[in-house]
């Protein structure tokens, strides 16, 4: 599972996830990409599940890049615990996603294969996505 090796602080404020992705919004490494079209959070488990799906579909061909990293801790209090007594423990890690953010990139495979792999992977993610192709070399 993806998570930071160490952080300055253990817990984080909830914050707001609005606006568009100004960085990480172009196909930079590969030939094809999976781009987010909505706001949301991707958990480390979702990122890994989609990665496995893509890897299984393309088999040995192609190279893949994961363009997001879950660096925000989400806390949760134990079940049947009364309110108060501080913030809960870190339960999992998420990557905050804005519309336009590139999530995965791939190269070295035919477009039909890439399109199908990303379609299968998109079913594992909690944000709506679209398939994009590199425009400028």
From Swiss-Prot:
Disulfide bonds: none annotated. One of its GO terms (cellular component) is cytosolic large ribosomal subunit. GO terms for biological process: translation. It holds the Pfam family Ribosomal_L16. GO terms for molecular function: rRNA binding; structural constituent of ribosome; tRNA binding. Part of the 50S ribosomal subunit. Belongs to the universal ribosomal protein uL16 family. Binds 23S rRNA and is also seen to make contacts with the A and possibly P site tRNAs. This is Large ribosomal subunit protein uL16. It comes from Xanthomonas oryzae pv. oryzae (strain KACC10331 / KXO85).
């Amino acid at each position: 599972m993806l998570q930071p090796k160490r952080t300055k602080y253990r817990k984080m404020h909830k914050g707001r996830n609005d606006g568009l992705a100004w960085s990480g919004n172009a196909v930079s490494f590969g030939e094809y990409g999976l781009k987010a079209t909505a706001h949301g959070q991707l958990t480390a488990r979702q990122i890994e599940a989609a990665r496995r799906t893509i890897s299984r579909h393309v088999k040995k061909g192609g190279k893949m890049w994961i363009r997001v990293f879950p660096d925000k801790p989400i806390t949760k209090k134990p079940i049947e615990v009364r309110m108060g007594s501080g913030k809960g423990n870190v339960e999992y890690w998420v990557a905050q996603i804005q519309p336009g953010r590139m999530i995965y990139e791939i190269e070295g495979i035919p477009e039909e294969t890439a399109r199908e792999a990303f379609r299968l992977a998109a079913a594992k993610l909690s944000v709506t996505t679209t398939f994009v192709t590199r425009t400028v070399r």
